């Protein structure tokens, strides 16, 4: 089944690419954080928009929608979430852990970890409590007044909550904009103008096309990884029954690939099928890149 992509002109604030593009406007991003956190921020800096954190070739990587730091070295990851996959708590834990690992170099003191905020802006109520703002920090279960003070904060925003009135006018205006696109203050008007600018920008069009091409390539890589992982499993199951030549013929892979799989199985008996397949694909891509250069 072919995946259908929106045209740039069809994107809105709830689309990852559009959200990242709009938040590349420093003042808009800073003000969004100020509205959500209800505090003033002197300045922010971008380490890398839609930063990709990929720790190892066999580890799960993540691409962050917006990743910035402020003048106090606090880290902010802001994500748009449009699908209720029932895994947001675990996903937020994973994101925060990956961010921490990315910050801390091997051998560095844990004291170098920065205060981090993982913020999910959802178009649904992630906990079904009717709240528009869910903030989580680690506290002692037996004594809730005792905070762990590990400097990690998780926030989930639900614009459809029924308790917006306890927040400031800017927050209410932002929630209304997220729900309906309604413009009710200067900030939401600027957001709307920025979205319009992105839609007609040739530079953003070029970036969007580049992203679509990369995503399509990743889909192909994922398909290839799945096929190679299946091949590794079949080789493992039949290694004692057939030779490399016979396995190549039976499985439809060239003998060189089968031999590499066999070698990897013997050298790394503790590796699972996907890890072996990932390593083989990595080596092949490195070889292809060397040939091209």
Each PLM stretch: what is its role?
Residues 103-108, 163-164, 182, 241:
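Short helix-to-loop capping/linker segments positioned immediately adjacent to catalytic or ligand/cofactor-binding
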Residues 2-9, 17, 71, 76-81, ...:
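Short, charged alpha-helical interaction segments and adjacent helix-coil junctions
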Residues 125-126, 162-164, 195:
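Short, catalytically relevant binding-site loops at active-site mouths
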Residues 1-153, 221, 288-293:
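Accessory alpha/beta interaction modules
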Residues 130-132, 166-170:
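Short conserved micro-motifs at the rims of enzyme active sites and ligand-binding pockets
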Residues 32, 36, 40, 160, ...:
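Amphipathic alpha-helical segments in well-ordered regions
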Residues 142, 149-163, 172-173, 177-180:
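Upstream accessory/linker segments immediately N-terminal to the RecA-like ATPase cores of bacterial MutS
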């Amino acid at each position: 089944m072919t995946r259908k992509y929106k045209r740039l002109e069809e994107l809105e604030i709830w689309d990852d690419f559009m959200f990242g593009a709009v938040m590349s406007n420093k003042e808009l991003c800073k003000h969004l954080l100020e509205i959500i956190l209800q505090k003033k921020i002197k300045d922010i800096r971008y380490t890398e928009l839609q930063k990709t954190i990929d720790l190892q070739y066999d580890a799960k990587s993540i691409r962050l929608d917006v990743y910035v730091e402020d003048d106090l070295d606090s880290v902010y990851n802001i994500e748009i979430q449009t699908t209720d996959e029932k895994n947001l708590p675990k996903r937020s834990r994973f994101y925060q852990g990956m961010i921490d690992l990315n910050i801390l170099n091997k051998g560095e003191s844990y004291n170098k970890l920065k205060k981090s905020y993982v913020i999910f802006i959802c178009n649904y109520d992630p906990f079904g409590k009717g709240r528009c703002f869910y903030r989580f920090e680690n506290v002692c279960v037996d004594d809730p007044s005792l905070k762990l003070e590990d400097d990690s904060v998780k926030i989930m925003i639900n614009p459809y909550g029924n308790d917006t009135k306890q927040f400031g006018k800017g927050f209410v205006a932002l929630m209304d904009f997220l729900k309906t696109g309604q413009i009710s203050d200067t900030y939401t008007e600027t957001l709307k103008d920025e979205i319009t600018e992105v839609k007609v920008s040739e530079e953003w069009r070029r970036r969007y096309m580049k992203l679509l091409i990369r995503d399509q390539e990743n889909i192909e890589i994922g398909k290839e990884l799945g096929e190679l992982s299946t091949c590794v499993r079949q080789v493992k199951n039949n290694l004692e029954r057939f030779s490399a030549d016979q396995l190549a013929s039976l499985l439809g892979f060239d003998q060189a690939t089968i031999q590499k799989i066999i070698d990897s199985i013997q050298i790394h008996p503790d590796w699972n099928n996907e890890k072996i397949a990932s390593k083989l694909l990595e080596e092949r891509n490195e070889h292809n890149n060397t040939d091209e250069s």
